[in-house]
Design a protein with these regions (language model features):
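Residues at alpha-helix caps and immediate loop-helix transition turns in enzyme cores, especially N-
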Residues: 16-20, 175, 209-210
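A short, conserved structural fragment
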Residues: 87, 184-194
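C-terminal scaffold of the Radical SAM
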Residues: 1-170
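Structural signal for well-ordered, non-membrane alpha-helices
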Residues: 74-78, 184, 210
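Short amphipathic alpha-helical interaction segments
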Residues: 169-184
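Basic, amphipathic "hinge/linker" alpha-helix immediately C-terminal to the N-terminal HTH DNA-binding motif
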Residues: 145, 198-203
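Short, amphipathic alpha-helical interaction segments positioned at domain boundaries
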Residues: 203-224
């Protein structure tokens, strides 16, 4: 048994809310195992970037619009309780795609990268395939391993406090909790006795939150 998964790119020029809602409805109608969703990135030198420069295409950077499109796509995907948010950029059908290799990698397990652009680590050695002729290897420090795990578990909408206590030391946990309290006040996170759970808006800003909290904790530790 296999899984059929799709990538959905949103926030392209002149895209309407109806477009992202229709994309979500198609994914559900076809019972696709999972949909990864990403805001459009315009790469320098691409045809789109040249068309924008030549003013053939109008492309406005509007974070409110980006979030509005994201929110409507997610809301439609979750309507009916057939799908759930599996990871910051992936919504999966219940009983479908389990994203096992990402779960292994993000919790500190060994994953050996093969294709160009792939990255992973094996027994504390980081590996990155830069191109078909060159690979980059690095020895991971104890801090790098632990904070990579922290970044990894923050790729998921529910962050287990037990997992955090297995990664962070007592003082680091205190600083982490300080930042989570700040996020909760902003409506990005909800806390209970066992977990921190990202809200829909928190998932949208998830990678920013992850980077922000890691920098905050490390600055508190090293800048005493």
């Amino acid at each position: 048994k296999g899984d059929v998964c799709v990538d959905i790119i949103y926030n392209f020029p002149e895209q309407k809310i109806e477009d992202v809602v229709e994309d979500a409805k198609i994914v559900k109608k076809l019972e696709i195992s999972s949909a990864s969703f990403y805001s459009l990135m315009v790469h320098e030198g691409s045809k789109l970037s040249k068309d924008i420069e030549a003013e053939k295409v109008k492309m406005e950077e509007d974070m409110k619009r980006d979030y509005l499109l994201y929110q409507h796509f997610v809301d439609e995907m979750l309507r009916g309780d057939e799908y759930h948010i599996l990871e910051l950029t992936k919504i999966a059908r219940n009983g479908g795609d389990d994203y096992k290799y990402i779960k292994v990698r993000n919790t500190g397990g060994d994953t050996f990268p093969i294709g160009v652009g792939a990255g992973g680590s094996v027994h504390g050695i980081g590996v990155y395939r830069m191109n078909k002729d060159m690979s980059f290897y690095s020895q991971q420090t104890e801090y790098h391993e632990r904070f990579s795990k922290l970044s990894g578990i923050m790729q998921f909408p529910v962050i287990s406090k037990e997992s955090l206590s297995n990664i962070l030391k007592e003082e680091e946990l205190k600083y982490f909790a300080e930042k989570m309290e700040e996020y909760e006040e902003k409506g990005l996170v909800k806390e209970n006795d066992d977990n921190y759970t990202l809200t829909t808006e928190g998932v949208f800003w998830g990678n920013n939150l992850s980077g922000d909290v890691i920098i905050y904790v490390m600055e508190k530790i090293f800048n005493k």
